[in-house]
A protein has these predicted regions:
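Solvent-exposed loop segments that connect transmembrane elements
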Residues: 159-171, 216-222
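Short glycine/proline- and aromatic-enriched beta-strand/turn motifs that initiate or cap beta-hairpins
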Residues: 21-88, 241-247
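Predominantly the C-terminal beta-signal and adjacent terminal strand-loop region
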Residues: 189-247
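Outer-membrane beta-barrel transmembrane strands
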Residues: 72-77, 81-85, 178-190, 194, ...
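Extracellular loop and loop/strand-boundary signature of outer-membrane beta-barrel proteins
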Residues: 65-70, 107-118, 169-176, 221-229
C-alpha cells in the first residue's frame, strides 16, 4: 500500500512538472523595440580657462633685432575665465561669455645702466554660441562660434637709472602701440563631466581679427602697421569648471 501511494505521488509529481514545462513552451513572448535616446546636453557653470595661441610675430621680431633684443617665440599663454548656460528653448544650445589675456616681455640691459625692452600683450573678450552633442554619458562634443573684441598692446621702452625727479627730463622713452580689433572664432571643445558639479575641457580654436585700429599712447593714430600684427592663430585651450552638468 505504501509502495502504491509513493508510486502515485511520484507519478503525479512527474506529470505536474511535464505539464508545467509544456505550458512554458506554449507561452509566446512578444518582442518590443525599445528606442534608447541619448540624453540632451545641459550645462550651467563657470571657471578657469587657459589657452596656448600660436600667433605671427615675424614683423615684431624684426624690430627686436634692430634694437638688440632677442626674438619673441610662439605660443603665447593666455588665461582668464568663462561662464555659460544652456538655453532650454532650443535643446543642446549654449551661450557663454569669456575674457582672457596674456603677455611676454623681451628685455636686455646694456652699458651705462641702459635697459631696453618690448612687452607684447594680447587679450580677448567676447561671447560664444555652442551646440552640444552627447557622445556617451558625461562626455560631450561642442562645436561653436565665438565673436567679440580683441586688443594688442606693444610697449617699447628705453630707460636708464631712473629717479622721481627724472619725470621732468627726457632721460627715458616709452611708447605704447595699442591695436583694437573685432574677431570671430570657430572652435570645438570636448567636455567631460567628472561629477554633476565638476567638468573638464580640452579644445581648439582659431580667432580671426578684422577692423583694426592702431594708436600710439592713446593719442595719435598709427599708419603702415604690418598686416601680420593681428590676433590670428591656431590655439589649444583647456578649462576647469564648476556648476551643474547633466548629460
Amino acid at each position: 500500500m505504501k509502495r502504491m501511494f509513493l508510486f502515485l505521488l511520484l507519478f503525479c509529481a512527474i506529470s505536474l512538472i511535464a505539464f508545467s514545462q509544456d505550458d512554458l513552451q506554449n507561452i509566446q513572448f512578444e518582442e518590443s523595440n525599445v528606442k534608447i535616446e541619448k540624453p540632451p546636453y545641459f550645462g550651467l557653470g563657470g571657471g578657469y580657462v587657459g589657452s596656448f595661441i600660436f600667433i605671427n610675430v615675424d614683423d615684431l621680431n624684426k624690430v627686436c633685432g634692430d634694437i638688440g633684443l632677442n626674438n619673441f617665440k610662439s605660443p603665447f599663454y593666455l588665461s582668464g575665465a568663462q561662464g555659460f548656460t544652456a538655453i532650454g528653448i532650443i535643446p543642446n544650445l549654449r551661450i557663454g561669455f569669456s575674457g582672457y589675456s596674456g603677455y611676454k616681455t623681451e628685455e636686455k640691459k646694456f652699458d651705462y645702466n641702459q635697459t631696453k625692452g618690448i612687452k607684447y600683450e594680447i587679450g580677448f573678450t567676447g561671447f560664444a554660441v555652442d551646440y552640444g552633442f552627447v557622445v556617451i554619458k558625461s562626455l560631450a562634443v561642442l562645436p561653436g562660434l565665438g565673436f567679440g573684441w580683441s586688443s594688442i598692446d606693444i610697449t617699447n621702452y628705453n630707460v636708464t637709472k631712473f629717479e622721481w625727479n627724472d619725470l621732468k627730463t627726457n632721460n627715458y622713452t616709452s611708447n605704447q602701440l595699442k591695436g583694437s580689433f573685432w574677431f570671430v572664432e570657430p572652435h570645438v571643445n570636448i567636455e567631460f563631466a567628472v561629477t554633476p558639479f565638476l567638468m573638464l575641457r580640452l579644445g581648439t580654436q582659431y580667432p580671426i581679427g578684422f577692423g583694426q585700429k592702431w594708436q600710439v599712447n592713446d593719442v595719435v593714430e598709427v599708419g603702415s602697421v604690418p598686416s601680420s600684427l593681428k590676433p590670428n592663430g591656431f590655439a589649444i585651450n583647456f578649462g576647469l569648471f564648476v556648476g551643474l552638468f547633466n548629460y
